Amino acid sequence: MSSQVVGIEPLYIKAEPASPDSPKGSSETETEPPVALAPGPAPTRCLPGHKEEEDGEGAGPGEQGGGKLVLSSLPKRLCLVCGDVASGYHYGVASCEACKAFFKRTIQGSIEYSCPASNECEITKRRRKACQACRFTKCLRVGMLKEGVRLDRVRGGRQKYKRRPEVDPLPFPGSFPAGPLAVAGGPRKTAPVNALVSHLLVVEPEKLYAMPDPAGPDGHLPAVATLCDLFDREIVVTISWAKSIPGFSSLSLSDQMSVLQSVWMEVLVLGVAQRSLPLQDELAFAEDLVLDEEGARAAGLGELGAVLLQLVRRLQALRLEREEYVLLKALALANSDSVHIEDAEAVEQLREALHEALLEYEAGRAGPGGGAERRRAGRLLLTLPLLRQTAGKVLAHFYGVKLEGKVPMHKLFLEMLEAMMD
């Protein structure tokens, strides 16, 4: 794998915050030009009944269930707030200049709005100025990030902010004091969870929605395009999540890039497996995209359904808990085998801290006894080779899709694919 990917700049990793819909993982400011939209045919989003208006304002799907994902031959995206043509990715979301400016004014002015109706006003290109309260709510719902707006109004600088203000920074390296936290799932006693685990639980990304088009054309290409769009957004979220892990941001930029380029698919695949744990022989690629093995094959994924379900069943047999999942996910990140890492000692230090946190959690879960926590931790760690093998098969499949050239892919997803297969 090459240590450099054409087109990936420090902005992908260093700029904050990230959003599910931004291929850069960064917020735009008034001193930065809009991010160039991916060339070629790209998935666009619209609402049923959407009409283009001469005012530059329309309808967008930000909410679950209301949006439709359709393929278009037009090389452009729509604003997720109002449906107008998006000028770029602003504050983490594909949006038009008008909604970008509205969101910025609202945050900088600390403006509070009140809906004159029932807080359910339709936000379209023509009606977006009718209710500012519902428009602002829509901005937040589709993922616009308040932290991306500079409050000081000073041009040329970058505001300092915390991604999650409720989370105190954790020391790294250092001790992570234990504290009680109720463990979900079963009438088991409370397990002590150290501060690192608590931090990982808090910074765990919110749910993503694929927004597939139920009325779309038959065939597997639209489904594969939906997954490519979903993966592109998940990469952005993964970059933001990785930066929230104590010790990762202290790595050099090149090492951050090398680590992420080598394990991003493992993180995504583990997320699919975790969402699928409550299901029976089904895969939850997103909250609104669940496929069984036959459905995955019909969607153009070949035998990936069976491959992914093998991993899911392994984790189901372990009765993987959420605390264990967030630790395993962080360990998968730190378990990078990239030969381009410059400071291997720093990455090893991160890996050791996460391993110790896993042992501490399992010790509290098992209670006093003869090494049960180490056996449990060992069984969890033994899933990492299967995870890597599974991710490799998923990568190979989508790289083949890329070579066929029939499915539109966004720039970041393409670059990360090429970095892995180079």
Curated annotation (Swiss-Prot):
MF term (GO), any: nuclear receptor activity
Q: Where in the cell is it found?
A: Nucleus; Cytoplasm
The gene from which this protein is expressed is ESRRA
What GO biological process, any one, is recorded here?
Answer: regulation of transcription by RNA polymerase II
Q: How does it assemble?
A: Binds DNA as a monomer or a homodimer. Interacts (via the AF2 domain) with coactivator PPARGC1A (via the L3 motif); the interaction greatly enhances transcriptional activity of genes involved in energy metabolism. Interacts with PIAS4; the interaction enhances sumoylation. Interacts with MAPK15; promotes re-localization of ESRRA to the cytoplasm through a XPO1-dependent mechanism then inhibits ESRRA transcriptional activity.
- List the protein's name: Steroid hormone receptor ERR1
Q: What does this protein do?
A: Binds to an ERR-alpha response element (ERRE) containing a single consensus half-site, 5'-TNAAGGTCA-3'. Can bind to the medium-chain acyl coenzyme A dehydrogenase (MCAD) response element NRRE-1 and may act as an important regulator of MCAD promoter. May function as a modulator of the estrogen signaling pathway in the uterus. Induces the expression of PERM1 in the skeletal muscle.
Q: Name its species.
A: Canis lupus familiaris (Dog)
Q: Where is this region: Disordered?
A: 1-67
The record's section on SUPFAM superfamilies has: Glucocorticoid receptor-like (DNA-binding domain), Nuclear receptor ligand-binding domain
Residues with the N6-acetyllysine modification: 129, 138, 160, 162
